[in-house]
Curated annotation (Swiss-Prot):
<keyword id="KW-0027">Amidation</keyword>
<keyword id="KW-0800">Toxin</keyword>
<keyword id="KW-1220">Voltage-gated potassium channel impairing toxin</keyword>
<feature type="site" description="Basic residue of the functional dyad">
    <location>
        <position position="28"/>
    </location>
</feature>
<keyword id="KW-0632">Potassium channel impairing toxin</keyword>
<protein>
    <recommendedName>
        <fullName>Potassium channel toxin alpha-KTx 2.11</fullName>
    </recommendedName>
</protein>
<keyword id="KW-1015">Disulfide bond</keyword>
<comment type="similarity">
    <text>Belongs to the short scorpion toxin superfamily. Potassium channel inhibitor family. Alpha-KTx 02 subfamily.</text>
</comment>
<feature type="disulfide bond">
    <location>
        <begin position="7"/>
        <end position="29"/>
    </location>
</feature>
<dbReference type="GO" id="GO:0005576">
    <property type="term" value="C:extracellular region"/>
</dbReference>
<dbReference type="GO" id="GO:0090729">
    <property type="term" value="F:toxin activity"/>
</dbReference>
<feature type="modified residue" description="Isoleucine amide">
    <location>
        <position position="39"/>
    </location>
</feature>
<dbReference type="InterPro" id="IPR036574">
    <property type="entry name" value="Scorpion_toxin-like_sf"/>
</dbReference>
<dbReference type="GO" id="GO:0015459">
    <property type="term" value="F:potassium channel regulator activity"/>
</dbReference>
<comment type="function">
    <text>Blocks Kv1.3/KCNA3 voltage-gated potassium channels of human T-lymphocytes (Kd=0.98 nM).</text>
</comment>
<feature type="disulfide bond">
    <location>
        <begin position="13"/>
        <end position="34"/>
    </location>
</feature>
<feature type="site" description="Aromatic residue of the functional dyad">
    <location>
        <position position="37"/>
    </location>
</feature>
Length: 39
C-alpha cells in the first residue's frame, strides 16, 4: 500500500505503516513516498 507520506528513508515510514498494519508492518520508501506492507 502506498500512503501519502513523504520520506527520505524507510524509518520515516515505519510509524505510519504500523498504524495501518500494526506490529506486522513493513515499510519502504519509494520515489519519496512511503510504501507499507504486511510481513
Amino acid at each position: 500500500t502506498i500512503i501519502n507520506v513523504k520520506c527520505t528513508s524507510p524509518k520515516q515510514c515505519l510509524l505510519p505503516c504500523k498504524e495501518i498494519y500494526g506490529i506486522h508492518a513493513g515499510a519502504k520508501c519509494m520515489n519519496g513516498k512511503c510504501k507499507c506492507y504486511k510481513i
